[in-house]
C-alpha cells in the first residue's frame, strides 16, 4: 500500500464496466486492483495516472490508446475538450443501455428487489434540446484569449468557447458569439476566481423550445465599465429562428462561481419567456426552475400522469413543486392538487402560471 502514497503515472488500463456517474471501471497491477477513470467507457484501453483516495483507486485520464468498437464520430468538434457532454462518441441507443445498467446496478447495490423495471423512454430530441444554458467567461489557457462557453474537462478554470454547441438551438450560439466578439473588442477581462479581478462572469440564456422566445442575461461584477447599449443593438440585429424578448444585466459581486443576482437591470424587453408543456402555458423567468429538455419533459410528465391515474375524489400533493409544472399538469387527474414549495419566488410564479392556464383546483 505504501507504493500508492504517490501517483502511478502512465498506467495502462482496460475499461470493462461503468459506475455512476460517468466513471469507467478497470483493473491494474499484479493484484488486479479496481480503479475508476472518469470519462471512459467499456471497451476502451486508456492511459491514466492512478492515485489512491481513501480506500479506492482513481485514475486521471491521460489518453485513449484504443477506442471501443462501438464508438462513433462525435457531432461536436469540441467533444473531449469541452466538459459539457459525456457520451457524444456513442449512439443514443448505446447511451441508454449504459444508463439502464447503471441504474439497475444502483438499485441492486441498495438491496432493492421489489420493483418492476419498465424500460427507458427516450427523449424525442437528442440535439438542440436544451432550453437553458449557463456559459462561463474565461480563457483557453494561462493568460490566453478571452473565451465564453463551458469549462474544459478536468479543469475548474479554463474555458472552451461553445460557439457551435450541439445541444442547443443555433439562436443561442449566435447570441454567445455576438457577446464574445463584443467584449473581445473592449478592455474587460473575465472574473478570475482566485485573484478576484476582472468583471465578466457568465452568460445565461433561456429559449422557449416551442415558442422560440429568448432572454439573454449578462452576469458581471459591479466593476464593469463598458457601455452595453451597442451590445444590445448587436443582439437585436441578429437573424434568428426565434425572437429575443428580453436582455438583462445581472450584477454579482459574490466570490462563489454561481449565477446569482445582487442587482438586475433590464436593458431591453422583459425578464421572462413563455413556453408550453403538454398544452399548458408557462411563464419562465431568469431563475425559475424548468426542465431543461422540453420535449423530454413532456415524455416524463406524461408518464407521471399515467402512473398517477385519474380519480374525481383524489387529492394529490406535489412536494418540492417549484413553479408548479407537475402540479398543474396533474390538475385534470384529481379533485384537488396541492403544491408544497419553500422558495417564495417559485410559489408566486406557480400562481401566475395557474392563472394563465385557468386552473381552479
Task: Describe the predicted segments one by one.
Residues 24-29, 149-153, 217-219, 350:
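Short, acidic/hydrophobic/Gly-rich beta-strand patch recurrent on exposed beta strands
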Amino acid at each position: 500500500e505504501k507504493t500508492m502514497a504517490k501517483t502511478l503515472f502512465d498506467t495502462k488500463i482496460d475499461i470493462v464496466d461503468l459506475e455512476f456517474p460517468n466513471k469507467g471501471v478497470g483493473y491494474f497491477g499484479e493484484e488486479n486492483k479496481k480503479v475508476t477513470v472518469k470519462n471512459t467507457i467499456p471497451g476502451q484501453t486508456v492511459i491514466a495516472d492512478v492515485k489512491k483516495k481513501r480506500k479506492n483507486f482513481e485514475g486521471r485520464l491521460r489518453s485513449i490508446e484504443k477506442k471501443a468498437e462501438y464508438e462513433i464520430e462525435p457531432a461536436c468538434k469540441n467533444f473531449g475538450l469541452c466538459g459539457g457532454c459525456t457520451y457524444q462518441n456513442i449512439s443514443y441507443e448505446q447511451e441508454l443501455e449504459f444508463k439502464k445498467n447503471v441504474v439497475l446496478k444502483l438499485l441492486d447495490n441498495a438491496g432493492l428487489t421489489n420493483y418492476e423495471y419498465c424500460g427507458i423512454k427516450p427523449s424525442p430530441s437528442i440535439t438542440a434540446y436544451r432550453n437553458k444554458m449557463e456559459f462561463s467567461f474565461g480563457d483557453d489557457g494561462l493568460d490566453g484569449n478571452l473565451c465564453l462557453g463551458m469549462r474544459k474537462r478536468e479543469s475548474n478554470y479554463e474555458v472552451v468557447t461553445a460557439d457551435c454547441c450541439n445541444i442547443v438551438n443555433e439562436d443561442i450560439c449566435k447570441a454567445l458569439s455576438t457577446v464574445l466578439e463584443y467584449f473581445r473588442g473592449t478592455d474587460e477581462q473575465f472574473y478570475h476566481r482566485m485573484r478576484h479581478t476582472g468583471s465578466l462572469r457568465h452568460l445565461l440564456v433561456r429559449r422557449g423550445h416551442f415558442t422560440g422566445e429568448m432572454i439573454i442575461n449578462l452576469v458581471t461584477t459591479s466593476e464593469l465599465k463598458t457601455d452595453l447599449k451597442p451590445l444590445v443593438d448587436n443582439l437585436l440585429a441578429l437573424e434568428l429562428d426565434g425572437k429575443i424578448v428580453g436582455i438583462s444585466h445581472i450584477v454579482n459581486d459574490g466570490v462563489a462561481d454561481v449565477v446569482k443576482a445582487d442587482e438586475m437591470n433590464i436593458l431591453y424587453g422583459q425578464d421572462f419567456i413563455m413556453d408550453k408543456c403538454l398544452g399548458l402555458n408557462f411563464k419562465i423567468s431568469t431563475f425559475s426552475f424548468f426542465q431543461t429538455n422540453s420535449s423530454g419533459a413532456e415524455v416524463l410528465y406524461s408518464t407521471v400522469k399515467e402512473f398517477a391515474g385519474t380519480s374525481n375524489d383524489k387529492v394529490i400533493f406535489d412536494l418540492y413543486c417549484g413553479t408548479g409544472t407537475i402540479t398543474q399538469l396533474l390538475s385534470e387527474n384529481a379533485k384537488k392538487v396541492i403544491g408544497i414549495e419553500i422558495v417564495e419566488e417559485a410559489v408566486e410564479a406557480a400562481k401566475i402560471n395557474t392563472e394563465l392556464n385557468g386552473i381552479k383546483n
